C-alpha cells in the first residue's frame, strides 16, 4: 500500500514526514536538510527553484523570488512573474511538489496522498486554498489538520496511557495559534483554540529591518526599503540577527556596499543587543498572551490545571517568547518535541490513523471561528459556535422578512463580531420558489455541516414547499474547479519541462565527460594506437564536439554513443595486442577511463557546475 505523507506547509519553512515502524520519521530533502525554506524563485531561462537554493539567490533575483506566500492563502492576492499571474495556491503547490518529490525519492515510489497542516485559526477560505494547493501539486489531501493539534499528536503518541491537559503555543513564521487539549486513553480532544493569522517570525524580522533602515536613513538620508535588492539583504541580515540573539546577547550587522550616492558607496556596520531587540518586539510578544487567556476561558480551565506546555514553531526559540510563556503559565515548557519538525510528524501520525497504521488514536478537533448567517438588520446570527467539536451538523429555522417574499439570499459569515458586515463572508446563495405568504410564516431550515477538515457546507430548505438549495463554501478568493484543473495541468507541464531540462543537462554533462576522457586517454596511449584507429577516434571526437554544446539532445546522444563504441573497439584491440607474445603490458585503467564517462552522473567526485537542479520544482 502506498504511503500517505504528513506535510507541514509553513510560512517560512516546510517539513515532510512519514510513519515507519509505528513512529513518524522526518524525511530529509535532496539537499540533506530536514526542513525546506518555503521559497520559490523563477529564473530567466524558465527554470523554477524551490527551497534553500531559491533562498540563496534571492538577493540577486529579488523581483522573481517569492517568500511567505502562506500569508496570502485564501485571499485574491496574486504575484506577477514575467507577465504571468500566480495565485497563492499555485505558488504553494510548487513548494508541495518539491516536498512530494523528496518523499518519493526517500520512499522509492510514487506518493499521491497527504495530510497537510494549517494554522488552527485559518478560516474556511484559507483551508480550501490549502486543499487546492495540494490538488494542484498532484496530491489527494486526505485531511486538513490544525498545526497545534498535529504537534500534540507527535508529543502524545508515546504517552497515550497518561491523562494530561496540554497547552500548545505555536508561533511560526507567519501565524500564531494556541490550543488547549486533553489527552487520555488515546483520545486527543481539543477543548479550545485561538490565535492570530497575521503574527509570526516575519513580523519580528520586520522590526529589525525597520530599525536598521531608520538608523541608516537618519545617517544617510537614504531609505533602503525602496530598493528591492538592498531590502532583500536587510531581510537576510535581520533573520540572521534574530537567530543569533537567541544564543547571544549582542550581534553585529555588517552589510558593506549596501547602496551608493553621489558621495560614494555606503555601508552598514552596527550592533544590535538582545535588550534592544526585546524592546522593538515587546508588543508582538505581548500580543500572544491575549489569545492564551481567551483559549483558557473557552476551555473553562485555569492555568493551574495545565499539565504540560508545548512550544511549536521556530520563533519560540526567541528568549523573550520563552520567558513570556513561562511567566504566563508558571511552567517550564516541555522539550519533548522539536519545534521545527513536530507539526509534520503529527501530520504523519494522523495519516497513519487514516490508513490504519496507527491504532487506538482518536482525534477530536474543533472549529476555530463561529459560523452563522446574516439576518434582519445585518445581524450575524450564529449557528455553530467557535470551539465546537468537528465534524458537526447544526440546523435552525428562519423565516422571511417581507410579505409575499418568494426567495431568500443566505449570506454565510465566519467570525466573532455581532454584525455580519464585520465578519468574514464565506459565500452567498439563494433559495427560490418559496410560496408567497405573510412575513414570518414560511419556515426555512438552514443547516451547517462542517467536515473533519473544518470545511463548511450549507443548505437551506423551505419546509413548506420542499424546495432546497445548498452550497459548498467557495469564497471569491478560492479557485473554481476549472481553475484548479488548469493549474494542475500547468504544474504537470512544468514538471515535464523540468524533467526534460534535467535530462538535457545530464546528456550534455555525460557527453562532455566522455569527450574529455577519450581525448585525454588517446593522448596518453600515443603510438599504442594505430594511425588509422586514431583518425577514426578523432573523427568521432570532432563529430561530438560539433554537437555537444547544441540543443539537439538526440544528436548528442548518438555522437556520444558512436564515440564510446569506437573507443571500445580500439580498447579491445589494445588488450589483444597487449596479450600477444613480446607485447608491452597495457594499463587497463586507461581503458577504464573511457568507461568512466558512461557513469559520470553517478560519480560522487564529478561536479557539474553549470546546472542546479531543485528536484523538479516540487
UniProtKB/Swiss-Prot annotation:
What GO MF annotations does this protein's record show?
Answer: ATP binding; ATP-dependent protein folding chaperone; unfolded protein binding
SUPFAM superfamilies assigned to the protein according to its UniProt record, in alphabetical order = Actin-like ATPase domain (SSF53067), Heat shock protein 70kD (HSP70), C-terminal subdomain (SSF100934), Heat shock protein 70kD (HSP70), peptide-binding domain (SSF100920)
Compositionally biased spans, kind Low complexity: 591-604
Report the function annotation for this chain. Answer: Acts as a chaperone.
InterPro entries listed in its UniProt record: ATPase_NBD (IPR043129), Chaperone_DnaK (IPR012725), Heat_shock_70_CS (IPR018181), HSP70_C_sf (IPR029048), HSP70_peptide-bd_sf (IPR029047), Hsp_70_fam (IPR013126)
Concerning HAMAP family, the annotation shows: DnaK
Task: Identify the stretch(es) annotated as Disordered.
Answer: 579-618
Per the similarity annotation, which family is this?
Belongs to the heat shock protein 70 family.
UniProt-recorded name of the protein:
Chaperone protein DnaK
Q: Which domain of life is it from?
A: Bacteria
Q: Which gene encodes it?
A: dnaK
The UniProt keyword set, sorted, is: ATP-binding, Chaperone, Nucleotide-binding, Phosphoprotein, Stress response
Q: Which Pfam families match?
A: HSP70
What the entry lists under NCBIfam families is as follows: PRK00290.1, prok_dnaK
Residues with Phosphothreonine modification: 175
The induction annotation reads:
By stress conditions e.g. heat shock.
Amino acid at each position: 500500500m502506498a504511503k500517505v505523507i504528513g506535510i507541514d506547509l509553513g510560512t517560512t519553512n516546510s517539513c515532510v514526514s512519514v510513519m515507519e515502524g509505528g513512529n513518524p520519521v522526518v524525511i530529509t530533502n535532496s539537499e540533506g536538510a530536514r526542513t525546506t525554506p518555503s521559497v520559490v524563485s523563477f529564473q530567466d531561462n524558465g527554470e523554477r527553484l524551490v527551497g534553500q537554493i531559491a533562498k540563496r539567490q534571492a538577493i540577486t533575483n529579488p523581483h522573481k523570488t517569492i517568500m511567505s506566500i502562506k500569508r496570502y492563502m485564501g485571499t485574491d492576492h496574486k504575484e506577477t512573474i514575467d507577465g504571468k499571474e500566480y495565485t497563492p495556491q499555485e505558488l504553494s503547490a510548487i513548494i508541495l511538489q518539491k516536498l512530494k518529490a523528496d518523499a518519493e525519492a526517500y520512499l522509492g515510489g510514487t506518493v499521491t496522498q497527504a495530510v497537510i497542516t494549517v494554522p488552527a485559526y485559518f478560516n474556511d477560505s484559507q483551508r480550501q486554498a490549502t486543499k487546492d494547493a495540494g490538488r494542484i501539486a498532484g496530491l489527494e489531501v486526505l485531511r486538513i489538520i490544525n498545526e497545534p493539534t498535529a504537534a500534540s499528536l507527535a508529543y502524545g503518541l508515546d504517552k497515550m496511557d497518561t491523562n494530561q491537559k496540554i497547552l500548545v503555543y505555536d508561533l511560526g513564521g507567519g501565524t500564531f495559534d494556541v490550543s488547549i487539549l486533553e489527552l487520555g486513553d488515546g483520545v486527543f480532544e481539543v477543548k479550545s483554540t485561538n490565535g492570530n493569522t497575521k503574527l509570526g517570525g516575519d513580523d519580528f524580522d520586520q522590526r529589525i529591518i525597520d530599525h536598521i533602515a531608520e538608523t541608516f536613513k537618519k545617517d544617510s538620508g537614504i531609505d533602503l526599503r525602496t530598493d528591492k535588492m538592498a531590502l532583500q539583504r536587510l531581510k537576510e541580515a535581520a533573520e540572521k540577527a534574530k537567530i543569533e540573539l537567541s544564543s547571544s546577547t549582542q550581534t553585529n550587522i555588517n552589510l558593506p556596499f549596501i547602496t551608493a550616492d553621489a558621495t560614494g558607496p555606503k555601508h552598514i556596520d552596527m550592533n544590535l543587543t538582545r535588550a534592544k531587540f526585546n524592546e522593538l518586539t515587546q508588543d508582538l510578544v505581548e500580543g500572544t498572551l491575549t489569545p492564551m487567556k481567551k483559549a483558557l476561558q473557552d476551555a473553562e480551565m485555569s492555568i493551574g490545571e495545565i499539565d504540560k506546555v508545548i512550544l511549536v514553531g521556530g520563533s519560540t526559540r526567541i528568549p523573550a517568547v520563552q520567558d513570556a510563556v513561562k511567566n504566563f503559565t508558571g511552567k517550564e515548557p516541555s522539550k519533548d518535541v522539536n519545534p521545527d519538525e513536530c507539526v509534520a510528524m503529527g501530520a504523519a501520525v494522523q495519516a497513519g490513523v487514516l490508513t490504519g497504521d496507527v491504532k487506538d488514536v482518536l482525534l477530536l478537533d474543533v472549529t476555530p471561528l463561529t459560523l452563522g448567517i446574516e439576518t434582519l438588520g445585518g445581524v450575524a446570527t450564529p449557528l455553530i459556535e467557535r470551539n465546537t467539536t468537528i465534524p458537526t451538523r447544526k440546523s435552525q429555522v428562519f423565516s422571511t422578512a417581507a410579505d409575499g417574499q418568494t426567495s431568500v439570499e443566505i449570506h454565510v459569515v465566519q467570525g466573532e463580531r455581532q454584525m455580519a458586515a464585520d465578519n468574514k463572508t464565506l459565500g452567498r446563495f439563494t433559495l427560490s420558489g418559496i410560496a408567497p405568504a405573510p412575513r414570518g410564516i414560511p419556515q426555512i431550515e438552514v443547516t451547517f455541516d462542517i467536515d473533519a477538515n473544518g470545511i463548511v457546507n450549507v443548505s437551506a430548505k423551505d419546509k413548506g414547499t420542499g424546495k432546497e438549495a445548498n452550497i459548498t463554501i467557495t469564497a471569491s478568493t478560492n479557485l473554481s474547479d476549472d481553475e484548479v484543473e488548469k493549474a494542475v495541468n500547468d504544474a504537470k507541464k512544468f514538471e515535464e519541462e523540468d524533467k526534460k531540462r534535467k535530462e538535457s543537462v545530464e546528456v550534455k554533462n555525460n557527453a562532455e565527460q566522455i569527450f574529455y576522457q577519450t581525448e585525454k586517454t588517446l593522448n596518453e596511449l600515443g603510438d599504442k594506437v594505430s594511425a588509422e584507429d586514431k583518425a577514426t577516434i578523432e573523427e568521432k571526437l570532432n563529430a561530438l564536439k560539433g554537437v555537444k554544446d547544441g540543443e539537439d539532445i538526440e544528436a548528442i546522444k548518438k555522437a556520444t554513443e558512436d564515440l564510446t563504441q569506437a573507443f571500445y573497439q580500439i580498447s579491445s584491440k589494445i588488450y589483444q595486442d597487449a596479450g600477444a607474445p613480446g607485447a608491452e603490458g597495457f594499463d587497463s585503467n586507461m581503458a577504464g577511463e573511457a568507461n568512466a564517462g558512461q557513469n559520470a552522473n553517478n560519480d560522487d567526485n564529478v561536479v557539474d557546475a553549470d546546472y542546479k537542479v531543485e528536484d523538479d520544482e516540487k
